């Protein structure tokens, strides 16, 4: 029987007291994960609309003899329980993005304008692969593994809070999550001992001036001009008002104003995001945005509205749980392939889980220059190297077993 070299490498390092799986099962499991990833990629659904996605996940879990419970509208939870012991949760998010796919594959998105551009299709598939492995060994399992298929990571307030509110983190000893990322090569893993991701907030600004004829700006209050100054001066918050050793990002994503070339705009609207790690810096940036806005509007005789929406909190890992993932990942991909980068400025509602119980979130490299898989997450040409999925499946599987003790 042919076994890929990657499978042989994994088998070579498997501890006998941790892994009880045959070579045949491993090949079948990997094929299953790829098949599932392609199915979900072909049929993406937006946040809180993952009805068919949820239905298919339920079908796959019920084939394994598991009792599946709904959480919220489209979230799912299922337990695999052996003898009495600890409880470890594994999480996969299941929603897609409003992106029109530009990849040409046999499994390209069939839902126009919707795409798994952040790899959640792979997350679902890998957790289903873990479920298959664990279900086969249920009789030898010491404890419970809780499978969390979470809706709406991409849309604050997110689906994680539903599991917390419904009590599915009670008496859970640890939780693990992973995320595919194309900027890290396939065969590599990135872990974070403590802070992994940032506070991810949103702000909205509306500036109200007075419209007028384009030839008579002195008789108007130009909201577009004020907004333009505001976009520029915002960058002084990070460069001049926060310590250099406490990172922050302030980005304006949209600016809408005016409707005709010769009419001075009476109104302007901006939206943007703020990313921070430190709670004090988060508050300072929030306040400084309004301070600058107020000063500009006062200087030009305009008024304003300002809304600041706190999004997902910073994702802070538990060092002990991360140490387990480090050890397992070293066994699966090799110690030299386990990276420890600086925290990412992205946001993740997995952070709500780690505020409640010990947990850890890591990145699985799925980029591959040789296969031209290099597009960033959230882009219309994003893809994953499917050869990396076996690593993510194995790391999640073995992390659960090791955390159970």
Where are these regions (language model features)?
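Metal-dependent amide/peptide-bond hydrolase catalytic core
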Residues: 228-405
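Histidine/acidic-residue-rich, glycine-tolerant segments that coordinate divalent metal ions
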Residues: 97-99, 104-115, 122, 137-265, ...
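Acidic/His- and Gly-rich active-site-bordering loop/insert found
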Residues: 18-116, 121, 125-142
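Acidic, Ala/Val/Gly-enriched low-complexity intrinsically disordered segments
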Residues: 6-9, 13, 18
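Divalent metal-coordination and catalytic microenvironments
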Residues: 40, 78, 90, 120, ...
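Non-cysteine beta-strand/loop elements that form the S-adenosyl-L-methionine
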Residues: 89-91, 203, 361-366
């Amino acid at each position: 029987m042919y076994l890929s070299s990657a499978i042989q490498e994994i088998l070579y390092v498997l501890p006998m007291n941790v892994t009880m799986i045959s070579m045949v099962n491993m090949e079948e499991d990997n094929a299953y994960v790829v098949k599932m990833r392609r199915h979900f990629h072909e049929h993406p659904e937006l946040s809180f609309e993952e009805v068919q996605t949820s239905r298919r996940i339920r079908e796959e879990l019920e084939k394994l003899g598991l009792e599946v419970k709904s959480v919220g509208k489209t979230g799912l939870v299922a337990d695999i329980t052996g003898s009495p012991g600890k409880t470890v949760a594994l999480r996969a998010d299941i929603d897609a993005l409003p992106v029109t796919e530009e990849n040409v594959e046999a499994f390209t998105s069939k839902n126009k304008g919707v795409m798994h551009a952040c790899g959640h299709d792979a997350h679902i598939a890998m957790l289903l692969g873990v479920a298959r492995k664990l279900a086969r060994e249920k009789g030898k399992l010491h404890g419970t593994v809780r499978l969390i298929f979470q809706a709406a990571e991409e849309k604050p307030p997110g689906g994680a809070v539903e599991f917390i509110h419904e009590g599915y983190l009670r008496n859970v000893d640890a939780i693990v999550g992973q995320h595919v990322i194309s900027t890290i090569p396939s065969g590599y893993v990135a872990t974070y001992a403590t802070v992994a991701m940032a506070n991810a907030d949103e702000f909205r600004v509306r500036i109200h001036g007075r419209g007028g004829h384009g030839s008579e700006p002195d008789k108007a209050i130009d909201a577009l001009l004020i907004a333009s100054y505001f976009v520029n001066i915002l960058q002084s918050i990070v460069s001049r008002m926060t310590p250099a050793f406490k990172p922050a990002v302030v980005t304006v994503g949209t600016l809408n104003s005016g409707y005709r070339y010769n009419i001075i705009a009476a109104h302007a609207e901006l939206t943007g995001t703020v990313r921070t790690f430190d709670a004090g810096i988060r508050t300072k940036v929030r306040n400084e945005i309004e301070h600058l806005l107020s000063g500009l509007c006062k200087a030009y005789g305009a008024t304003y509205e300002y809304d600041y929406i706190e999004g997902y909190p910073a994702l802070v890992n538990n060092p002990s749980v991360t140490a387990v993932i480090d050890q397992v990942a070293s066994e699966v991909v090799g110690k030299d392939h386990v990276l420890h980068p600086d925290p990412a400025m992205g946001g993740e509602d997995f952070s709500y889980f780690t505020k409640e119980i010990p947990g850890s979130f890591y990145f699985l490299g799925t980029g591959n220059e040789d296969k031209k898989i290099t597009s960033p997450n959230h882009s219309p040409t994003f893809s994953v190297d499917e050869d990396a999925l076996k690593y993510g499946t194995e790391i999640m599987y073995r992390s659960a077993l090791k955390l159970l003790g």
